[in-house]
Amino acid sequence: MAVPFRRTSKTRKRLRRTHFKLRVPGMVECPNCGEMKLSHRVCKACGSYKGKEIVSK
């Protein structure tokens, strides 16, 4: 069974983990009601998507 020849240093470990992070979600303003919403998703406030009402309130 293969084992590491040398111990991985703190710096080497942290440099490897710099890419393992959470991203900020892409928020845009709804053109219909002006609320902030996730892009490419139905607006939770007014229920519209691409100018059409998808969810009736």
Swiss-Prot record:
Ribonucleoprotein among keywords: yes
Entry keyword set: Ribonucleoprotein, Ribosomal protein
Presence of keyword Ribonucleoprotein: yes
SUPFAM superfamilies on file: Zn-binding ribosomal proteins
Source taxon at top rank: Bacteria
MF-aspect GO terms: structural constituent of ribosome
One Pfam family cited in the UniProt record for this chain: Ribosomal_L32p
Listed GO CC annotations: large ribosomal subunit
Example GO biological process: translation
Coiled coil: none
Family: Belongs to the bacterial ribosomal protein bL32 family.
Name used for this protein in its record: Large ribosomal subunit protein bL32
Organism, scientific name: Exiguobacterium sibiricum (strain DSM 17290 / CCUG 55495 / CIP 109462 / JCM 13490 / 255-15)
Gene (name only): rpmF
